[in-house]
Amino acid sequence: MHATNMLSYTFKVNFLEIFGMTTYKAPLADIKFLLNDVLEMPSIAKLPGYEDATPDMIDAILNEADRFYSEVLAPTNMPADSQGSKLDGNNVITAPALKGVYKKIVDAGWSGLSGSTDFGGQGLPTLLSVAVDEMSHSANMAFSLCPMLTKGVVTALSLYGTKNQKEVYLDKLISGIWSGTMNLTEPQAGSDLSAIRTKAIPAGDHYLLSGQKIYITWGEHDFTDNIIHLVLARTPNAPEGVKGISLFVVPKFLVDDNGLLKERNDVCCVGIEHKLGIHASPTC
């Protein structure tokens, strides 16, 4: 029995030594082959609005993305997972290993790669952005879930937001100055969203929401000054089922029409889930 315990302990140590010290290197040859020869990036680059996406430009971006994510983000993967995120009152303190990484990504312009040029983005093909996101997720998936959710909010607002919502939120979301989340799941409503109970009551020119959401990826953190939540809720007298669900913009801090922050909203995080392999990602 003693020998078995020792062998088990030795295996665990060796496992951490081997896999904890692995480095990430993007399979650039494979990525470029898929983009150019399978998915026909050169043809996409000829479409209106993508004139800047020349082969040389695409190649340079992919090479720099490989360097950036392998040198800046990948080394944070193991320590950030060990450290995890911590809840302090209603505020989340992110893993120390990630301090400064988010700002480096924003400053380097990776957040707005395929964002609309009307709102400060670079307007490059989404296909290129997907390839770069693959590198980011491979380097540190827990961290990369944050910008991934933000892109989802950008897409939703771009397609369905009002003119005012686009003007107030999109430039800061595309640049990464603010982040975003999707709030769907509730304790009694997982895959069956028709069962959600969160209410949205009209109050003048806005709504007052009440309810509980769970499993919200990066629902609270200290990377950005504001977090823009997209929340599913029901208005009074809404029909039953999925047809009675509406989507609301709920910022962590209220925002005026000029995009300036006002007082903190009532939305808050009351707990953090512990998810295997992504402890650095605060799931609220």
Indicate where each model-derived feature is located.
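Short hydrophobic alpha-helical segments enriched in small aliphatic residues
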Residues: A3-M6, T10
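Amphipathic, small/basic residue-rich leader segments at the start of a protein or domain
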Residues: F11-L145, V168
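Flexible, glycine/threonine-enriched loop-and-boundary segments that flank and lead into catalytic domains
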Residues: D88-K103, W110-G115, T181-A203, Q212-H221
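Core alpha/beta catalytic barrel or barrel-like domain that forms the active/cofactor pocket
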Residues: G112-T117, A139-T155, G176-E186, S246-L247
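Internal maturation/activation junctions in enzymes
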Residues: L149-T150, G161-D205
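Short Gly/Pro-enriched turn/cap motifs at secondary-structure boundaries
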Residues: Q188-S191, E220-D222, P239, K275-P282
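A short core secondary-structure module
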Residues: H206, S210-R264
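Flexible, small-/acidic-enriched active-site or ligand-binding loops
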Residues: L260-C284
